[in-house]
Amino acid sequence: MNGKFDKYEYLQDLMRRRGFAWGSFEIYGGSRGFYDYGPLGATIKRKIERKIREAFIREGFFEIETPDITPEQVFIASGHVEKFVDPVVECKKCGMRFRADHLIEEFLGIDVEGKSAEEMSRIIREHGLKCPECGGELSDVFYFNLMFETYIGPYKDKKAYLRPETAQGIFVNFKRLNAFARNKLPFGVFQIGKAYRNEISPRQGMIRLREFTQAEAEIFFNPNETEHPHFNEVKHEKLKLYPIENQLKELGEVEVTAEEAVKRGYVMNSFFAYYMVMIKKILLDIGIPEDKIRFRQQLPEERAHYSADTWDAEVYSERFGWVECVGLAYRTDYDLSRHMKMSGADLTVMIHYDKPKVVKRIQVSLNMKKVGPKLKADAKKINEIIKSMDQKELEKLVKDLNEKGKVTIEGYELSKEDFIVKEVEEKITGEKIVPHVLEPSFGIDRPFYLLLENSLTVDEDGRIYLKIKKDMAPIEVAVLPLVAKEPLTTIAYEIYRTLQKEGFIVVYDEKDSIGKRYMRYDEIGTPYCVTVDNQTPEDGTVTIRDRDTREQIRVKIEELPRKLKELIFG
């Protein structure tokens, strides 16, 4: 193989030609940001989802399924209507739109992460940046919401969106899920499904899609109890980390154990480190090489509006560099608190103490004798507002009265003398809290592509094949008669049917020479070819050919299912 071999271009051709994946709507010219999975690709995708699902279930997480279409008020509460936006410029000549930050970084080499629309507009003007399609003048930068908008039913007032993440379907069901978990923290809930983001100018093939599959888990926990109960089981596992400080100083990654990651303060607690290890193990189980995996901490300006800290599990691509495949976001109580406020639902959990506690509380009420004549009918309303305040709000009210001498409620200016403030002691057996959330969020499409890219192998003799993890292969076994003649074909077909019944993904193929057939199945990653040759009718044995080594062993036909299970699944 010469030095001009382009792995990306070869892989794109292979995916289209052999039934892995290709751009959607081809006969109508295609549409960027959409991909179809062919028979082989759909099988691998299903296996990736299964690996993630099995890992989540082993952790004791509950699986649910919720709608893709979501009413607008859910995303108003979650902040997506206001904040799920990207900066855009439009060509005044041809009308094409582009991500402003990507355009500036690609053509000017200027990092504009965290810059405002006004600042990016100024950079475009000062450097004379033009439309890359036609050379026309670009507009000022404006923001574009990435959610696909729709309506529920025929009424325009029933606005809805295709969900940009699966997470909100879990949060709005928290009350029922908490009851299912018997009000005991921590617990995890996950779902696997489609998400949609109306990307402005998606490029990079399957790396940036408008419709994609996610596997997201929301782990609800008490923020006062951040030690994972099973951390000792994983504390010696190695993690390659790229924290913010190292990024800013260009120091590169550090490799530490999960325990060291917590002790050195790279991650905030053992909950974080535990799920980093879980994510790494899932990626390894899918077949991503360990040396191609790292965890990069997002810079503050990169984080989503709901995140207090996020680490991305990235996988290295020869074509695209480090690619985010899994996010691990600390969402705090952001989502549940917002949905409580918007919906009025109680999304708290009662935490019971081992022993009752005596606590001091502030009680505040209106001095009705003093303010009654002034407030008249509104006095009762204002008193109810005060009663609805929690301790933090009452403490702030008292602090404002002490410092400023007055506060304003419902348009009425009230002085310190208008209130009765008492400090009382109460014996309590527990407290209500809003749980915090840690979210491992897997994309499925990116790991799919990166698994194929990292599996594509070129031997010294020029053989090109997918060295995919054996249990991830889309076809696990190919049964091949040496030549298309009796009795070899009948014996081979009977073996094929037996392996089907044993649960293997298996094909029967008698077309072309045996060498061409070996190449055909090597190329798509089939780990083993079973060959029925002239010796088979004599002694009831067949050969099993290994994809990677090309070595062959002979086994009895009756031993074939057991041997293949051992070779493929261990």
Swiss-Prot record:
Keyword Aminoacyl-tRNA synthetase: yes
Known role: Catalyzes the attachment of glycine to tRNA(Gly).
Catalytic reaction equation(s): tRNA(Gly) + glycine + ATP = glycyl-tRNA(Gly) + AMP + diphosphate
Annotated gene: glyS
UniProt name for this protein: Glycine--tRNA ligase
Chief place where the protein resides: cytoplasm
Organism expressing this protein natively: Pyrococcus horikoshii (strain ATCC 700860 / DSM 12428 / JCM 9974 / NBRC 100139 / OT-3)
Keywords carried by this UniProt record: Aminoacyl-tRNA synthetase, ATP-binding, Cytoplasm, Ligase, Nucleotide-binding, Protein biosynthesis
One GO MF term attached to the UniProt entry: ATP binding
Entry annotated with the keyword Membrane: no
Leader sequence segment: none
Record family assignment: Belongs to the class-II aminoacyl-tRNA synthetase family.
Subcellular location as annotated: Cytoplasm
Protein origin, superkingdom: Archaea
A GO-annotated cellular component: cytoplasm
Binding site for substrate: 99, 165, 212-216, 439-443
Chain sites annotated for binding ATP: 197-199, 207-212, 324-325, 443-446
Enzyme class: ligase
EC number, as in UniProt: 6.1.1.14
One GO process term, biological-process aspect: glycyl-tRNA aminoacylation
